[in-house]
Amino acid sequence: MNKKQLILLCMLAAGGSIQAQQWPDAPAEARPGTRWWWLGSAVDEKNLTYNLEEYARAGMGAVEITPIYGVQGNDANDIQFLSPRWMEVLKHTQAEGKRTGIEIDMNTGTGWPFGGPEVSIEDAASKAIFQTYDIEGGQEIVQDINVTDKKQQPYSVLSRVMAYDENGRCINLTSHVRKDKLEWKAPAGKWKVIALYNSKTRQKVKRAAPGGEGYVMNHLSKTAVKNYLSRFDRAFKSSKTSYPHTFFNDSYEVYQADWTEDFLDQFARRRGYKLEEHFPEFLDESRPEVSRRIVSDYRETISDLLLENFTRQWTDWAHKNGSITRNQAHGSPANLIDVYAAVDIPECEGFGLSQFHIKGLRQDSLTKKNDSDLSMLKYASSAAHIAGKPYTSTETFTWLTEHFRTSLSQCKPDMDLMFVSGINHMFFHGTPYSPKEAEWPGWLFYASINMNPTNSIWHDAPSFFDYITRCQSFLQMGKPDNDFLIYLPVYDMWDEQPGRLLLFLCAQSVHWRVKFSSNKSEI
């Protein structure tokens, strides 16, 4: 072999080595995803293709369709959610997603929380109304028993009427009520009569899209959740549309929903005693020991019902139809670890700018304060690690800054915060679908940065997306390795926190996790 041949052979070998070291094609899960707002669902095939091609060119790997309210003046082009036409454009989206290599996910509803036009008042989110009457015994009692709040009267159903005397005696008087009147010969003594009504919150879906307006469903009712999901089955099966890769559920923002129709029966079966026999202690705001124990049992029962009747039923339904679930459990009145772990992909949520004391990082009057506590973010990844889930996702850049004032240099620290919190599958918040012909700046959603082609940061977005993809590729191949573990003292939280319904809200976590966080810091 002469000298020239040897040099050529070495060059070819080196070239082959370099080629072998090229970064492999990343799967869709390793690339960043985005929440894809369909404003009014006013989409069309041409612009769906245009949008997906732009996202794929920049390096996105998934879109999550979330229909919301429409664009002002564009009502004529709105498409009713789950209508035959809506299913047509979803089919087109799925076909184009397959062609461009983008996974197509969708919200199991419009706006948030789950609800809509087919949620009857019977299946709507429920709340308890307690009314107390002080009665002197030793006489025939005729007492009006009715909800005093006139707005609630049409929705309230009497569940129990219980009487308690000073010696702890308890009598069930429910059968003594006829036509809103209690007729009872009260034994001697002072009696406290407590009436319980199963009523309704009357909460409507927030930011609902056309065809998605209506009551929020009762997440604690197995029947209500089943009825809600049946609407999707009818739409997908009648249109012969494939179910999406993933069904998504946003953070739990169901307010005052502290009851469900069969709650007393569920409580007795699970806790071993009847709550109605202890209404005075349950309602005692001074919170002596016995009251704290009863309220803790109440909160555990609420947690069980949400986990079983909503989260697990929703996930089982998705699996039956070939899909998986991605869920934001924060805000739930439940053990967050349990609820996060019950789905395929637990998802947390970031709020505001992560500073990390970076010199020169731009801040101004529109920069949102960071509320992304590390321990709060890690509930999702902790649940994933405990349950052996391969992915933990995040809703990223929520309320970071105003749409067009957000720079990629402000995005990166927030993304890094998610990575150190155990996140390996991030979603932007977010990307509005916008027709190519729409006048700049295109269609917008109020609560977000604007991660789409109309924003000036889109020019450099592919490099940022590539950074995310490389980080997530390694994180998804790795396994969690923690120096120490901390047990979540959920029973202490249920016991110590005031009130009855305890929502584990991110914005209020400073109150319910104070002892947990201080102990963690000491460790």
Residue ranges, per PLM feature:
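An acidic-aromatic substrate-binding cleft motif
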Residues: Q22-W38, Y197-K200, A208-K222, S242-T246, ...
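Mature N-terminal segment immediately following signal peptide/propeptide cleavage
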Residues: A20-A62
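Carbohydrate-binding surfaces of carbohydrate-active enzymes
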Residues: P32-G33, T49, A62, L82-W112, ...
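Acidic/aromatic-lined carbohydrate-recognition and catalytic surfaces
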Residues: I68-H176, W184, V193-Y197, V205-K206, ...
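Active-site mouth loops of central-metabolism enzymes
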Residues: W37-K46, M217-N218, L400-S407
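Aromatic- and acid-rich polysaccharide-binding/catalytic face
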Residues: G189-N218, V339-D364
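Bacterial Sec-dependent N-terminal signal peptides
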Residues: M1-Q21
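Alpha-amylase-like alpha-glycosidases and glucanotransferases acting on alpha-linked glucans and related
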Residues: Q153-P210, H278-L305, S381, H385
